[in-house]
Amino acid sequence: MDESALLDLLECPVCLERLDASAKVLPCQHTFCKRCLLGIVGSRNELRCPECRTLVGSGVEELPSNILLVRLLDGIKQRPWKPGPGGGSGTNCTNALRSQSSTVANCSSKDLQSSQGGQQPRVQAWSPPVRGIPQLPCAKALYNYEGKEPGDLKFSKGDIIILRRQVDENWYHGEVNGIHGFFPTNFVQIIKPLPQPPPQCKALYDFEVKDKEADKDCLPFAKDDVLTVIRRVDENWAEGMLADKIGIFPISYVEFNSAAKQLIEWDKPPVPGVDAGECSSAAAQSSTAPKHSDTKKNTKKRHSFTSLTMANKSSQASQNRHSMEISPPVLISSSNPTAAARISELSGLSCSAPSQVHISTTGLIVTPPPSSPVTTGPSFTFPSDVPYQATLGTLNPPLLPPPLLAATVLASTPPGAAAAAAAAGMGPRPMAGSTDQIAHLRPQTRPSVYVAIYPYTPRKEDELELRKGEMFLVFERCQDGWFKGTSMHTSKIGVFPGNYVAPVTRAVTNASQAKVPMSTAGQTSRGVTMVSPSTAGGPAQKLQGNGVAGSPSVVPTAVVSAAHIQTSPQAKVLLHMTGQMTVNQARNAVRTVAAHNQERPTAAVTPIQVQNAAGLSPASVGLPHHSLASPQPAPLMPGSATHTAAISISRASAPLACAAAAPLTSSSITSASLEAEPSGRIVTVLPGLPTSPDSASLACGNSSATKPDKDSKKEKKGLLKLLSGASTKRKPRVSPPASPTLEVELGSAELPLHGAVGPELPPGGGHGRAGSCPVDGDGPVTTAVAGAALAQDAFHRKASSLDSAVPIAPPPRQACSSLGPVLNESRPVVCERHRVVVSYPPQSEAELELKEGDIVFVHKKREDGWFKGTLQRNGKTGLFPGSFVENI
C-alpha cells in the first residue's frame, strides 16, 4: 500500500475530499472538513452532525481539530514509505500508519469503518501466497520435526500447519491433520500470520483529572479499564483511546499487551546519533526536532497533575502542583477508592496500593511496597525557605506517580514547613524514605518522649498497642492527631493516636538555666513535667523558666501537671481531696462547673519566664468573682518526698496571682501557701498549717503582707464549706473519654459559683490536668494545683451583658523557642458556620456525631486539627475532626 492509497482512507464523509489539518471534530467525535461544516451552517443556520444529527451548540471556528488526524499526517511526512515487496522498514512503517489510520477512520466516520479490515500487522517472516492453502493463519514446514517432548507437534517438510496461537517469539501452537501440538518458529515459514491483537493496555490504577479545562488533553480512566494504545508521546506518556475519547495518559499507570509493547518500543524517542530502529536513521533524525517541540507542548499541558498525599486527612486541592520523574512502571494490583482522600488534606488522584517514595536528586522514584506496611524512615517535607516549586517544576518529563495509601503511611510536617504548605494550599505528603537520601533536605528535629495515659488496642496492623504508663519515642507527628514512633519497651515501630499519650519533659535543675524544656510546639497533648524531690523545711526553691520548682537532687519522685488556673482576690479557693478516693472521684472533687452559661470571661494562665513586675498593685485588675480552677486528670508517679510546683506569671498591666503546691507524705499532708509580692518574686512557704491525713488545702493569695493565722483559718473554713456545698449539688461525672482532649462540661445553673473554664495551655509547660492516685494501700496521696487567672478591664462583663455567651479565645500558644511574654489581650473567637461533608461517628462522649449535611458552629480550632463546636441539629457541644467539615 502506497502513500496515496493510505491518504484515500482519510476523506471527508460529506464531500469525499481528502481531510487536512483544518478538519474539525464535533462533540459526537465525528470529523468533517471545515468547508463542509461552514456550508451546513450557511444553508441551515444551525449545525448538526451529518451522520448522527446531533445538534452542535458552538460555532465552527470554536470546534477543536482532530489531533490524531494532524499527527497522522505529520507522521506520513516524517516517515516516508519505501517501495518494495520485501519486508523492509518502509513496509513496517506503512503497516503502523495503516493501523493508526484505521483508528482515525473508526472515530471519524462510519463510512470508513470498512477500511479497518485491510490492516496487516507486522510479522517475523513473509512469503508469497501458496495455492491451495486454507484461509486460516498457517505456515509451511521447512524441515522435518519429530518432537522432543510430549505435546510437541510432529510434521514433515512441506506440510501446511494451521496456526492456533503464538506461545512466545520462539514457539507456536498449531494443528496438522487434526493433531495439535507445539513446534519451534524457525522450523516453519509463515504464510498467513496470526491476526495480531490490537495494541491495548489495562489500567492498574484510577487516573482522574482534577482540572478538566487545563488538562483536557488527558484521558481519565478507572482501574481495570482496557485502553487502545495509539502511540507513545514521550518517555512517560502515551496516547490512547477509551470508548470514543482520545487523550494522553501516564505509562506507569497501565500494563501493555505484547502488541502495545512493540508499539511503545517502536515509538520510543530516538537518541541522536543512534539508529532509531525499523525506520531509516535519516528519517529518525529528521523527526527529532518536531518530536521535541511536540513534547514540549504536551509537557506544558500535563504540568498540573498531583498525587494524593495523605494523610492529611483534611482535603485541600493542591494549587501549585509539580511533575517529577518516575521510574519504569510499578505494577501494584490493589486500588483504594477515594474515601481516604478526605483524610489527607489533598484530593488529587484516587488512592492505590502502598509504596515507598524515595527522594533523590534525580527525581521521585516509586518502589514496590515492603513486607511491612510500617516504614522506619522519617518523613520528608519541603523546608519553607527553599524555592522547591521552581526547581521541581522544571524537571522533565512530568510525573504522575502511582497513588499512595494515606491510611497506611502517616507523616507530618514541622511547624515551618506546615505553615508554608498551608499558605500554598498544599498539605503534607505522606512519604517515607531512607534517612540518607533525604537528610540533606529534611530539617533536623529531635524525637520527643511521650508516656501513654490511656490504653489503646490497635485496629490495624501498622498501629502500636499502648499500655498505660508505657514510654514512647515519637519522631513524627501528623496533623490529624496521629503519632508515629517506637515503644521504648518493645522497640516496635508504628502509629498511634496522639491523644492517648502525653509529652514528658525533665525540669531543669540548674537555676541559672532559663530555657523552657518544652516538647515540640504544635502538639496539644497533655504535658507531664518531671521534677526532682525537695527537702522539707529547706530554703525556698528558685523557679525555673518553665515555672516548675526543682532541687539539685537527681532522682525524680513525682510528676506534677500544671492546670488551667483561675482565682479571685476576694476569696482564697481551697481544693479539697481525700487520699482514699479513686482517680475518677478525686477528679470529680476538684472539677468545677460554670453557672449561668459562662457569664464571666475566661482568662488563661500561660507558663512563661519569671519576670519582675515592680510597682504593680494587685488591686489594679478586675478578676471574675468566685472563679475556680478546672483541673483535668493526669497520671502521677509515686513518690514520698516533698515536691513543689509553681507557676509564675508576669504581664505588662497586671500583677501575678499564683499557683502553688502540696507537699506529699505517706502519713500526713501539710499545706503550703504561695504568696506573691508586688515585685513579682515568688516565695515558697514550706510546711504550714497541719491538716488531717485525708485532706489537703491549697491557698492562693495576692497580698504583699503576711496575714494572721486566724484570718486565714476563718477564710479557709468558709471556703471549705462553700466547696462542700457545691460538690453535693454537682452532677456526677463519668470516666474520661478517649478523646483528643477532655473538655470541662457545664454543670447545673443553680450553683452559687460564677466563672468560666480556663482554656488549654501549651504542652510541656502548663497543662490542664490534675489528679491523684494511691501510692500504697494505707497512705493517702493528694495533689492539687491551683492558680490565678488574669483578666483585662476591657474584657470584664456584667452578669446581664448580652454578649456574655461569646467565649474568650486562649492566648496564642508559645513556640518551643519563644520565651517572651504572652499577649496582653485575649481575642474572642467568632463562631463560624461549617457544613459536614463526611459523616463522623463519635469515638467518645466528648465528641460530636456528625452526619453529612449538618451545620456546626465552630467555637475553637485546635492546632492538632480538631474543632470544638455546637451542632445546630441538636444543640450539643463537643469535639470533632476539622477535616470532616468545610467552612460556609
Swiss-Prot record:
<dbReference type="GO" id="GO:0051865">
    <property type="term" value="P:protein autoubiquitination"/>
</dbReference>
<keyword id="KW-0677">Repeat</keyword>
<comment type="similarity">
    <text>Belongs to the SH3RF family.</text>
</comment>
<dbReference type="GO" id="GO:0043370">
    <property type="term" value="P:regulation of CD4-positive, alpha-beta T cell differentiation"/>
</dbReference>
<feature type="modified residue" description="Phosphoserine">
    <location>
        <position position="532"/>
    </location>
</feature>
<dbReference type="Pfam" id="PF13923">
    <property type="entry name" value="zf-C3HC4_2"/>
</dbReference>
<dbReference type="GO" id="GO:0061630">
    <property type="term" value="F:ubiquitin protein ligase activity"/>
</dbReference>
<dbReference type="InterPro" id="IPR017907">
    <property type="entry name" value="Znf_RING_CS"/>
</dbReference>
<keyword id="KW-0333">Golgi apparatus</keyword>
<dbReference type="GO" id="GO:0030027">
    <property type="term" value="C:lamellipodium"/>
</dbReference>
<feature type="domain" description="SH3 4">
    <location>
        <begin position="829"/>
        <end position="888"/>
    </location>
</feature>
<feature type="modified residue" description="Phosphoserine">
    <location>
        <position position="304"/>
    </location>
</feature>
<dbReference type="InterPro" id="IPR050384">
    <property type="entry name" value="Endophilin_SH3RF"/>
</dbReference>
<feature type="compositionally biased region" description="Polar residues">
    <location>
        <begin position="693"/>
        <end position="704"/>
    </location>
</feature>
<dbReference type="InterPro" id="IPR001452">
    <property type="entry name" value="SH3_domain"/>
</dbReference>
<keyword id="KW-0862">Zinc</keyword>
<dbReference type="GO" id="GO:0005078">
    <property type="term" value="F:MAP-kinase scaffold activity"/>
</dbReference>
<feature type="domain" description="SH3 3">
    <location>
        <begin position="445"/>
        <end position="506"/>
    </location>
</feature>
<dbReference type="Pfam" id="PF14604">
    <property type="entry name" value="SH3_9"/>
</dbReference>
<feature type="zinc finger region" description="RING-type">
    <location>
        <begin position="12"/>
        <end position="53"/>
    </location>
</feature>
<keyword id="KW-0832">Ubl conjugation</keyword>
<dbReference type="GO" id="GO:0008270">
    <property type="term" value="F:zinc ion binding"/>
</dbReference>
<feature type="compositionally biased region" description="Polar residues">
    <location>
        <begin position="305"/>
        <end position="321"/>
    </location>
</feature>
<dbReference type="GO" id="GO:0001764">
    <property type="term" value="P:neuron migration"/>
</dbReference>
<dbReference type="InterPro" id="IPR001841">
    <property type="entry name" value="Znf_RING"/>
</dbReference>
<keyword id="KW-0728">SH3 domain</keyword>
<keyword id="KW-0479">Metal-binding</keyword>
<comment type="function">
    <text>Has E3 ubiquitin-protein ligase activity. In the absence of an external substrate, it can catalyze self-ubiquitination. Stimulates ubiquitination of potassium channel KCNJ1, enhancing it's dynamin-dependent and clathrin-independent endocytosis. Acts as a scaffold protein that coordinates with MAPK8IP1/JIP1 in organizing different components of the JNK pathway, including RAC1 or RAC2, MAP3K11/MLK3 or MAP3K7/TAK1, MAP2K7/MKK7, MAPK8/JNK1 and/or MAPK9/JNK2 into a functional multiprotein complex to ensure the effective activation of the JNK signaling pathway.</text>
</comment>
<feature type="region of interest" description="Disordered">
    <location>
        <begin position="617"/>
        <end position="637"/>
    </location>
</feature>
<keyword id="KW-0966">Cell projection</keyword>
<feature type="compositionally biased region" description="Basic and acidic residues">
    <location>
        <begin position="707"/>
        <end position="718"/>
    </location>
</feature>
<keyword id="KW-0863">Zinc-finger</keyword>
<dbReference type="InterPro" id="IPR013083">
    <property type="entry name" value="Znf_RING/FYVE/PHD"/>
</dbReference>
<feature type="domain" description="SH3 2">
    <location>
        <begin position="196"/>
        <end position="259"/>
    </location>
</feature>
<feature type="domain" description="SH3 1">
    <location>
        <begin position="134"/>
        <end position="193"/>
    </location>
</feature>
<dbReference type="InterPro" id="IPR035795">
    <property type="entry name" value="SH3RF1_SH3_2"/>
</dbReference>
<dbReference type="GO" id="GO:0048471">
    <property type="term" value="C:perinuclear region of cytoplasm"/>
</dbReference>
<feature type="modified residue" description="Phosphoserine">
    <location>
        <position position="735"/>
    </location>
</feature>
<dbReference type="InterPro" id="IPR036028">
    <property type="entry name" value="SH3-like_dom_sf"/>
</dbReference>
<feature type="region of interest" description="Disordered">
    <location>
        <begin position="516"/>
        <end position="549"/>
    </location>
</feature>
<dbReference type="GO" id="GO:2000564">
    <property type="term" value="P:regulation of CD8-positive, alpha-beta T cell proliferation"/>
</dbReference>
<dbReference type="GO" id="GO:0046330">
    <property type="term" value="P:positive regulation of JNK cascade"/>
</dbReference>
